[in-house]
């Protein structure tokens, strides 16, 4: 196994003051990219997740620098020293006005690339937000057998990335899943689920249940399989893209040790580990240091392989 890379993204979204006024939305079907600026000269990725920017602009929100000058959001990020953006993509968010669908992703990725910024694509594999408390299958994927679920993951991944390629955008990183501490693509049937541990009925069924007692069984083998077909789909389109497996609670050494030991044991593939930390919501109490313990432990382990 090649040496593992590690990445901790502290996405500091440095939005300035908003003011409401009309604004034209960028056409996602616009032509190819103009000449790009050279990427910012640095080996350190300093980025922000600004996936909501097109929706904000559509609602008339504007962005300003510290001098009060109205500035394009992407340009503002670059002016603040950022050299990368993370952009999420959902499968079919029609109930959310199609924000963060493939076309919207391409629109934003082109704007970032035009400024010489690196792009990370964040696949949620859901029709809306996926996180440890909700890893719901896209509506169109419900009822699929395991083989067809894998094909759906691979097909969606490749389709989105091919759309970026057609637009002249080459992502540097691709996340296969978002905050998948609890797995992805949950199902009541453990044979079809990608849960990493047993999940409550109220989480699997969402608003259709309030039961916290019934738990649906984990299937880490399926989770590894879903990650792997996503990984392979990424490499089939962008062979040099860095594939990230992303968890939250970056301070939790035991979580990362358990998760990636299980993923390795089930044949999982990844190039980089993505860690999220949320100081605003988390009482760190020096936990920021423990996130380094896993990276140190795992790096030592990889060096010994």
Where are these regions (language model features)?
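Distinct, well-ordered alpha-helical segments
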Residues: 59, 132-133, 186-189, 251-266
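Single conserved hydrophobic/aromatic residue that forms the stacking wall/gate
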Residues: 294-305
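Substrate-binding cleft and catalytic face of glycoside hydrolase catalytic domains
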Residues: 76-199, 215-219, 224-234
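Short, acidic/polar
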Residues: 63-77, 157-160, 254-263
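Bacterial Sec-dependent N-terminal signal peptides
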Residues: 17-38
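Boundary/entry segment of secreted carbohydrate-active catalytic domains
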Residues: 34-70
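Aromatic- and acid-rich polysaccharide-binding/catalytic face
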Residues: 258-287
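Aromatic-lined carbohydrate-recognition surfaces of secreted/lumenal glycan-active proteins
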Residues: 172-178, 227-254, 304
């Amino acid at each position: 196994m090649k040496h593992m890379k590690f990445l901790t993204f502290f996405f500091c979204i440095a939005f300035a003051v908003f003011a409401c006024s009309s604004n034209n939305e960028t056409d996602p079907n616009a032509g190819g990219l103009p000449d790009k600026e050279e990427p910012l000269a640095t080996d350190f990725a300093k980025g922000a997740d600004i996936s909501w920017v097109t929706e904000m602009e559509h609602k008339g929100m504007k962005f300003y620098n510290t001098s009060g000058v109205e500035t394009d959001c992407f340009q503002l990020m670059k002016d603040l020293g950022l050299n990368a953006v993370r952009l999420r993509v959902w499968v079919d968010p029609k109930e959310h006005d199609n924000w963060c669908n493939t076309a919207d992703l391409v629109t934003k990725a082109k704007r970032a690339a035009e400024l010489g910024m690196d792009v990370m694509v964040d696949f949620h594999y859901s029709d809306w937000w996926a996180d440890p408390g909700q890893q719901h299958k896209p509506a169109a994927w419900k009822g699929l057998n395991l083989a067809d679920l894998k094909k759906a993951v691979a097909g969606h991944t490749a389709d989105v990335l091919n759309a970026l390629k057609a637009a002249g955008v080459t992502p540097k990183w691709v996340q296969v899943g978002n905050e998948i501490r609890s797995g992805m693509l949950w199902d009541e049937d453990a044979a079809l689920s990608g849960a990493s541990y047993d999940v409550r009925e109220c989480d699997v069924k969402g608003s259709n249940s309030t039961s916290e007692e019934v738990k649906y069984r984990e299937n880490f083998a399926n989770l590894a399989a879903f990650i792997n077909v996503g990984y392979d789909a990424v490499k089939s389109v962008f062979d040099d893209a860095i594939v990230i497996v992303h968890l939250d609670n970056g301070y939790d050494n035991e979580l990362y040790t358990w998760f990636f030991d299980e993923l390795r044991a089930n044949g999982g593939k990844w190039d980089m580990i993505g860690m999220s930390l949320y100081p605003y919501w988390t009482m760190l109490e020096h936990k920021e240091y423990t996130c380094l313990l896993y990276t140190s432990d795992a790096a030592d382990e990889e060096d010994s392989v």
